């Protein structure tokens, strides 16, 4: 590898450490409410997704079906969610908050979203859009390169 590439890679890893820090902060936030990080992001997904299903959560969060099922069962047993059969697909159930669950989720998620809002406001929407565009491009190219190696 050439020296210039190594410098860029070092800069990239500094950015990657920033993403890891974001996840670590989010995990600490979740723990302050007695939740695992995974249960927190699933709760967040239910809160922000209309007619949410386990399939949607698995797809959006890239989580295994079993992991999502365990979290859904946890929230169900706590009385925070109810599962309603989808009339269009009887094998699928949509996830809805109970009154208690809605209060529980609002207490956790709305505070977190307020922090997100304040952060985005400081950084600026244009910078956020650029960041997302670059991150998605990088991920797509990287996935293609890794797939080439895997499929050899």
Regions found by a protein language model. Give the residues of each.
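C-terminal regulatory/oligomerization modules of transcriptional regulators
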Residues: 1-4, 125-152
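N-terminal leader segment of winged-helix/HTH proteins
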Residues: 1-33
